[in-house]
C-alpha cells in the first residue's frame, strides 16, 4: 500500500500542532515520562512547527509523483521505497522537533541512512554517487557527534535548554570553540554548504527524480535550520557562536559566487540546479550570519522559498 495516507496524516498532524503552539505557546513532550534534562524532550514552537508543516507538505508533494514514477520504472520496489521514504520523513521531523543535542544526531543518522538507500535506487551511477555521499555524510555525522561530546564534557547535559543555562557559567574555552566548530562543520556538510557541497551535484544528477525532489527541497533545509537553532537558541550570545557566525558569513559569500558561477557552466539541467542550490544556501547562511531581525526573517523565508521552488523544479 502506498504511503499517501501516512503522509496526509503527518501533514494534518503537523498543521494541528502548529495551530496549537501559535495559540497556546511552546509545546513540550517528555519521551517515556522521563523529565528533562535527564530524559529526551521534544519542543515545538511556531518556528519548528512551521518547519514540520513544510517537511510534511514537501514529502506529500514528492510522493504523489513517486507513485507514478515507480509504477512505470520498478513496481516491485514500491514497498521498499515507501518504507524508506517514511523513515526519511520521520528523521527530518525529529530533527526539527527535538530539544536534545544527541537526539538530533540520532535523527540525522536515521534520515541519512534512509536517504542513502533511496538515492541508490537510481542505478549504477546513482550507487557510486550515493557511496560518495555516504562517505562525506559520515564525516559530517562524526563531526557533529564529536562536537556534541565536547559540550557534554563541559556541561554534563545534552538538553538544549539546560545546556544554554549551564554554558553561561562555563565561560569561553578552547573546548567550547572546538565543539561549536565541529557541530557547525558537521551540519554544514549535511546542508551542502560551500565548500562542503562535493556530494551534492552527482547525487542530484543520478538519483531517482522523486527522491532528488524531496532531498533537494527538504534535507538540506532542515540541516540549515539545525545550524540556526544551535547558534541562536542554544549558544546565542556566546563569543564562540559569534565567531561561528562570522565564519558562516564568509562561507556564504563564497557559496553565492561559486555556486552561481558553477551553475552557469553546466550543460546538464539537474547538475545546474544542484550548483544553484549551493548558491542559494549561501544566501541562507549569510542571512544567519548577519543576525539582524530583518536578515534572519529573510533567511528563514528563503528556506521556505527555496524548498518549495526546488521541489517544483
Predicted stretch roles:
Residues 61-71, 79, 87-102, 114-313:
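Hydrophobic transmembrane alpha-helices and their helix-loop junctions in integral membrane proteins
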Residues 1-83, 161-165:
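Transmembrane helix-loop-helix hairpins at membrane boundaries of multipass inner-membrane proteins
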Residues 3, 102-106:
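Short, aromatic-rich membrane-interface segments at the entry and exit
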Residues 109:
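Short phosphate-coordinating micro-motif centered on Lys-Gly-acidic
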Amino acid at each position: 500500500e502506498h504511503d499517501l495516507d501516512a503522509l496526509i496524516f503527518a501533514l494534518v498532524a503537523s498543521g494541528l500542532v502548529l495551530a496549537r503552539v501559535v495559540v497556546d505557546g511552546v509545546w513540550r513532550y517528555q519521551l517515556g515520562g522521563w523529565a528533562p534534562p535527564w530524559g529526551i524532550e521534544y519542543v515545538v514552537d511556531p518556528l519548528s512547527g512551521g518547519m514540520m508543516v513544510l517537511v510534511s507538505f514537501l514529502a506529500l508533494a514528492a510522493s504523489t509523483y513517486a507513485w507514478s514514477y515507480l509504477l512505470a520504472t520498478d513496481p516491485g520496489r514500491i514497498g521498499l521505497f515507501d518504507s524508506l521514504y517514511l523513515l526519511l520523513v520521520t528523521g527530518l521531523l525529529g530533527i526539527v522537533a527535538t530539544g536534545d543535542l544527541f537526539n538530533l544526531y540520532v535523527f540525522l543518522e536515521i534520515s541519512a541512512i534512509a536517504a542513502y538507500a533511496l538515492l541508490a535506487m537510481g542505478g549504477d551511477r546513482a550507487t557510486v554517487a550515493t557511496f560518495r555521499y555516504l562517505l562525506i555524510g559520515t564525516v559530517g555525522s562524526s563531526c557533529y557527534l564529536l562536537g556534541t561530546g565536547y559540550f557534554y564534557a563541559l556541561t554534563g547535559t545534552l538538553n538544549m535548554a539546560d545546556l544554554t543555562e549551564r554554558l553561561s557559567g562555563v565561560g569561553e574555552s578552547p573546548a567550547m570553540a572546538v565543539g561549536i566548530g565541529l557541530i557547525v562543520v558537521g551540519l554544514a556538510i549535511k546542508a551542502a554548504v560551500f565548500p562542503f557541497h562535493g556530494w551534492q551535484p552527482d547525487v542530484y544528477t543520478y538519483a531517482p527524480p522523486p527522491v532528488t525532489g524531496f532531498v533537494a527541497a527538504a534535507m538540506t533545509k532542515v540541516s540549515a535550520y539545525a545550524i540556526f537553532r544551535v547558534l541562536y537558541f542554544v549558544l546565542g550570545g556566546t563569543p564562540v557562536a559569534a565567531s561561528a557566525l562570522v565564519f558562516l558569513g564568509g562561507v556564504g559569500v563564497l557559496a553565492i559566487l561559486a555556486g552561481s558561477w558553477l551553475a552557469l557552466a553546466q550543460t546538464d539541467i539537474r547538475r545546474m540546479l544542484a550548483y544553484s542550490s549551493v548558491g542559494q544556501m549561501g544566501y541562507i547562511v549569510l542571512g544567519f550570519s548577519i543576525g539582524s531581525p530583518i536578515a534572519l526573517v529573510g533567511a528563514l523565508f528563503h528556506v521556505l522559498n527555496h524548498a518549495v521552488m526546488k521541489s517544483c523544479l
